[in-house]
């Protein structure tokens, strides 16, 4: 695939995706689970490396019919969509965004999704009972985005961790054998926080998925109470997971040295897929500001959903610093509250200066975005800490998850220490203690790093990288990949005789 033309890549992926759909139709057992795997960053990425041309149909088009179509519309269109008699698409040709314009065209009413809003026969538009009802499909897709970027991050961390345990370099002790790169604390600092993040993001995405299902069931009964909170959380988590995963994937790539920049390492493709998620289904800056609006409203009105309860119920008792996971969770809450209050103060200050409301908002955007990001990080940390209370966890699993959780939540504090100094009463000695804990956790998790990434159960075909191969035979596989290049099919490429050789003999 790497050496096909752009047009040939598209045709080949379309051929394979259509063949897969035929195979799937012949094997109904486990069809739903297989379909989900084919549309995401797992099995689908192994077979369809350049993307699945009909993934959009299953991920967005069918959910939109289910969530926004009337009973009659679903009866007419859903079966056709499931059987691929109709296919939903953006009509993209991957060169640019297409568009469709109408001039005095009357769209049949039955082809307007009218579960929540309607157009009457006389042309009157009837608004939905809640303006955010039409967001249901986007909320669903944002949950899928969180899961997808997390899986891509798992792939990147697996590749980088395995390679770092194969690659040996320099001398840790003079005269000793070159150690595995993973034995250097600096490499652990690069790779173990992303490893821990895969668990935090997945647990938060699972939590959000459960909330989505609960809210969806409530909405079917006409209860919209959970919708604002769900919308705010889905915006926050999508923005956080995509942006953090992009940064972590790039760190993983850099941790593999020059080999990480090779096309066959699969890092360029993984990075491209994750960074794209920063923009689609809501550009992250726009989403952060939507979240901020919800937070400001909640703080001012003292009313909101479960995820923002901390903005309504003030912390009681002395604001001491406790470095246990539960204590650190309280620090995150203080920061989230503090940054919302700072943003509100900035808005009020702008209003006193005479700014119109929209200008006051624009001039407070930096503070508002920071508040929204703190809210998102709090949700991830809460999901991670709460998961450790699960009684079903075995003692060894609970132990390693606890270490990963503690590493991750301390990593974020050290990375954003200014916010914790400003809002959480953190002092220099607290930060030094957390830093000491952090490096201790790096050393404690290091011996289990390969076992942890192996537990992801990602086959070599899904990783698609010689650097992350399960058997560790990295360099032979790199040689084999290089041999596939059309440039390496001849000992001396004809361009040498045509261009370089005359230059060498020209006596410039």
What spans do the regions from the language model cover?
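Flavin-dependent oxidoreductase catalytic core characteristic
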Residues: 1-508
């Amino acid at each position: 695939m790497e050496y096909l033309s752009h047009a040939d890549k598209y045709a080949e992926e379309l051929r394979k995706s259509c063949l897969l759909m035929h195979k799937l139709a012949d094997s109904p057992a486990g069809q739903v689970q297989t379909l989900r795997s084919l549309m995401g960053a797992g099995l689908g990425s192994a077979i369809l490396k350049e993307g699945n041309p009909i993934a959009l149909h299953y991920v967005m088009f069918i959910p939109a019919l289910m969530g926004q179509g009337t009973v009659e519309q679903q009866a007419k269109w859903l079966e056709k969509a499931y059987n691929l008699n109709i296919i939903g698409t953006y009509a993209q040709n991957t060169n640019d965004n297409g568009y469709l314009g109408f001039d005095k065209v009357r769209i049949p009413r039955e082809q307007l999704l009218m579960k929540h809003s309607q157009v009457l026969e006389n042309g009157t538009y009837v608004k939905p009972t809640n303006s955010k009802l039409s967001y249901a499909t986007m909320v669903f897709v944002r949950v899928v985005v969180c899961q997808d970027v997390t899986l891509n991050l798992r792939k990147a961390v697996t590749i980088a961790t395995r390679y770092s345990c194969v690659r040996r370099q320099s001398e840790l002790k003079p005269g000793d054998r070159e150690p595995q790169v993973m034995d250097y604390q600096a490499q652990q600092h690069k790779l173990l926080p992303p490893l821990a993040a895969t668990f935090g993001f997945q647990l938060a995405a699972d939590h959000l998925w459960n909330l989505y299902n609960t809210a969806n069931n409530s909405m079917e009964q006409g209860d919209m109470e959970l919708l604002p909170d769900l919308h705010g959380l889905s915006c926050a988590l999508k923005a956080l997971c995509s942006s953090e995963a992009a940064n972590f994937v790039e760190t993983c790539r850099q941790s593999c040295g020059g080999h990480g920049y090779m096309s066959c390492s699969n890092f360029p493709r993984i990075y491209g897929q994750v960074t794209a998620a920063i923009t689609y289904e809501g550009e992250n800056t726009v989403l952060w500001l939507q979240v901020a609006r919800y937070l400001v409203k909640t703080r001012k009105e003292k009313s909101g959903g479960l995820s923002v309860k901390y903005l309504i119920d003030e912390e009681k008792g002395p604001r001491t610093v406790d470095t246990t996971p539960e204590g650190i969770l309280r620090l995150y809450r203080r920061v989230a509250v503090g940054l919302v209050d700072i943003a509100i103060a900035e808005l009020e200050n702008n209003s006193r200066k005479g700014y119109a409301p929209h200008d006051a908002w624009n001039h407070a955007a930096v503070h508002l975005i920071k508040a929204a990001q703190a809210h998102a990080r709090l949700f991830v940390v809460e999901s991670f800490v709460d998961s450790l209370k699960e009684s079903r966890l075995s003692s060894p699993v609970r132990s390693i998850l606890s270490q990963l959780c503690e590493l991750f939540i301390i990593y974020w504090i050290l990375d954003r220490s200014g916010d914790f100094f400003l809002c959480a009463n953190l002092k220099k000695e607290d930060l030094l203690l957390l830093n000491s804990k952090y490096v201790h956790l790096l050393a404690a998790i290091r011996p289990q790093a390969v076992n942890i990434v192996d537990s992801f159960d990602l086959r070599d075909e899904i990783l698609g990288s010689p650097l992350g191969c399960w058997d560790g035979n990295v360099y032979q596989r790199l040689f084999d990949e290089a041999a596939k290049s059309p440039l390496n099919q001849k000992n001396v490429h004809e361009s040498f005789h045509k261009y370089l050789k005359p230059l060498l003999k020209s006596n410039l």
